[in-house]
Design a protein with these regions (language model features):
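Switch/communication elements of ASCE P-loop NTPase nucleotide-binding domains
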Residues: 1-127
């Protein structure tokens, strides 16, 4: 709820001063949220960015939020020229020694893979149940 209030204040400032173009940094906004709401965060940030020009830097461990950006890339054809993709995903390995930019394909999938322990955990647990 606090996040929504703060975003409302920032949006108000952009309306009062059109030259105001903030960059909002948010650490793990998905904490204590249901998976459906975690994925809706991507919708929220995209909507605020498109309508009010607010830029976001989000630190997340949410597979749901990341997957939602992939779906949004596909549905909105963000990787099809002349469209610009508003999402940039940077992966930091578990040791913090390496980083790389995750590049989206037009179908929303990534060209490269996340490191071990992100997307593969869910699949591995499902296989354990079979």
């Amino acid at each position: 709820m606090l996040l929504l209030f703060r975003l409302a204040c920032i949006i108000h400032k952009t309306k009062v001063n059109p030259a105001y173009r903030p960059i909002v940094i948010i650490e793990e906004p998905e904490l204590n949220l249901h998976p459906k709401l975690q994925s809706r965060l991507a919708d929220l940030f995209l909507g605020v960015h498109r309508k009010h020009g607010v830029e976001f830097i989000i630190e997340t461990h949410s597979e749901y939020a990341i997957r939602k950006t992939q779906a949004l890339v596909k549905v909105n054809e963000f990787e099809v020229p002349p469209n610009e993709n508003p999402f940039t995903i940077v992966y930091f390995d578990k040791d913090g020694l390496s980083t790389w930019k995750m590049k989206y394909r037009p179908d929303g999938r990534f060209e490269n893979e996340f490191g071990e322990g992100f997307y593969d955990i869910s699949g591995n647990l499902t296989l354990d149940l079979i």
